[in-house]
Amino acid sequence: VEWLNIDFEGRRKAYIFNDPAELETIIKRAYDAGYTSEMVIQDFIPGDDSRMRVLNAYVDQHHRVRMMFLGHPLLEDPSPVAAGNYAAILPDYNEGVFRRIKAFLEDIKYEGVANFDMKYDERDGEYKLFEINLRQGRSSYFVTLNGFNLAKYFVDDLVEDTPFDGNTLFGRGSKLWLEIPKSIFLDYVAEGADKETGKRMLKSGDWGTTLEYSKDMNPLRWLMIRHMFSIYKKSYAKY
């Protein structure tokens, strides 16, 4: 949060450094601009956006994982201030990933929504966790879109105190989530089997977006979304 309130030459949401001197320069500029918190330096995992995965889980008040759902991002926002924000997500399934993260969450006695970002490392065939967000992510509607309403899990647990049999639901889905116009998906997602899957979902109507909710639509909102989409188109063309 503190990072959002400072400004300096070269400021981005995230960086990839090949030169230690460049790293030192950015760190100095950040602290000179008023940043006071720690910084995280991680090994760069090779590969494009399609190597990413995002996992959402709901853990109840008794620290039991009730539901897990995995997404396969195909495209991210390319702009410097929003790098890493997902723009297109396919549903995915990986029981090995589910079970390892389930064990971790229950071992630390976690409670609430957990949102994990990870990337497949082709160097050793393992998924490397980048972070856990202690909240829903900005793209977490892809879980609800695929039939697993995150808000309902809160109500069932904290309001209704619905009994849980201990069998964690590992979700499977069939819908593509988009934050961007369909034209950007078609133009910028790398060619391959995953893109073909997404194209079939678009053609069959098995897709959705957080933005265009019909019951919340009015002329001003429609114009705002069109403006947002025009910014996305300029951003992808530029970066």
What do the predicted segments below correspond to?
Residues 94, 144-147, 151:
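NAD(P)-dinucleotide binding in Rossmann-like oxidoreductases
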Residues 105-141:
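Conserved metal-phosphate-binding beta-hairpin within the catalytic cores
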Residues 152, 156-239:
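Peripheral (often C-terminal) accessory segments that flank ATP-dependent C-N-forming ligase machineries
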Residues 40, 111-115, 164-170:
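Flexible, glycine/charged-enriched surface loops at secondary-structure junctions
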Residues 75-86, 133-147:
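Glycine-rich phosphate/pyrophosphate-binding beta-alpha loops
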Residues 1-8, 12-16:
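Conserved anion/nucleotide-ligand pocket segment
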Residues 80-83, 91-116:
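Oxyanion-binding "anion nests"
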Residues 17-79, 92-99, 120, 126-128:
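Phosphate-binding site of ATP-dependent enzymes
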